[in-house]
């Protein structure tokens, strides 16, 4: 589903190293209604907090992270993409999340890929990686150093490659959560 900027502009706790205001509005237009009027809080930024999956998990377990989040990645070829998750990121032996989860591209074009209902492989976290989607492949996979990732077609979201290439180098990663406005 192609996204266009909606009328809702949330207040961001800090400037994003990845997203423009129009891109934020486009993502907001795809969010569940309960999240659309919320302000965004930057829980983790690789630019601010260093490049470490452990740091991202620690931020995701913080007092402000009780539920939904937006994970955004920018690769070294200036493509931006990410995921909305209905549950917090955590290390788990199995997939978790709900059908509200989706993956998206932001740059070069804003498009959301929603749950296909083919499986329920929404999100999982291990000590050495995190991933969205599954079946034929991961929609999004990031390594423990947050330096490399891969993306491909996933049965969960029926998405194409989200990045500039299936294997990519990461420039920035951000994790945003929602606060009532």
Model-identified regions with their sequence ranges:
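Phosphate-recognition beta-domain surfaces
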Residues: 1-69, 74-181
């Amino acid at each position: 589903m192609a996204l266009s900027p909606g009328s809702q502009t949330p207040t961001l706790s800090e400037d994003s190293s990845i997203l423009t205001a129009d891109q934020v509005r486009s993502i907001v237009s795809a969010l569940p209604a309960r999240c659309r009027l919320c302000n965004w809080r930057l829980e983790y930024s690789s630019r601010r907090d260093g490049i470490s999956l452990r740091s991202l998990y620690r931020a995701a377990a913080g007092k402000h992270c009780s539920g939904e989040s937006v994970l955004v990645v920018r690769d070294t070829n200036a493509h931006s993409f990410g995921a909305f998750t209905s549950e917090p990121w955590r290390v788990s032996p199995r997939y978790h999340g709900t059908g509200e989860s989706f993956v998206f591209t932001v740059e070069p074009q804003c498009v959301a890929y929603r749950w296909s209902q083919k499986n329920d492989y929404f999100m999982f976290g291990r000590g050495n990686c995190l991933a969205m989607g599954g079946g034929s492949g991961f929609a999004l996979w990031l390594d423990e150093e947050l330096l490399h990732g891969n993306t491909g077609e996933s049965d969960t979201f029926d998405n194409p490659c989200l990045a500039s290439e299936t294997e990519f180098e990461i420039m920035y990663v951000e994790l945003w959560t929602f606060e009532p406005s």
